[in-house]
């Protein structure tokens, strides 16, 4: 893959997947660092039942997102300290063109007695675009097939269809709307069921097998999770690559990789 294509696939395909809450939470649990060396925080910001935004540190210490709301003649301030409350209230009052001496009078009344501490119940609203997850699986399956079978796979009719869809992604045409890739789906029920019984999530598994219908199928299982377990049709001419019933597979231990 050329530098431009690789960069565009990262922007328009990988980015949605790796930054999704489900994937970030897996990476956070396994302490897998991103390219910038940071461990992702999937729970960085949520909301309370009454809609207040709450930030969560990497150590799961909550703090409010500073804000000022006007309710009638009152200004209600959310802050984490006296200094922070005075600062944001002063900014708000200046924007309301209040005289400086009045601003000083009001903010001087803010002290520790004005604060209420609470243990928030934090909600996270998570939206999953399944088609974009399937697009990620399609890319991984295609790249794995090229890695295993070389240039001869590039001429396969199904490979050409997959490549055409990935080229749409590279061009940015799938940025706002992504249809379901016909070659990709979630993994079959028997595989999903077995994943649900496994407590081991620190690995990726990918395989290619031929079926009795002469189809070349990839199973892409990321973090051993049903949310990221996929099946990709790579070819309708499996006999060109594998004998019936033959399988090629790789197992990537992420915990071992991180410790090296």
What are these regions (language model features)?
Residues 2-30, 37-40, 48:
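Short Cys/His-centered divalent metal-binding micro-motifs
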Residues 1-2, 57:
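Helix N-cap / beta->alpha transition motif
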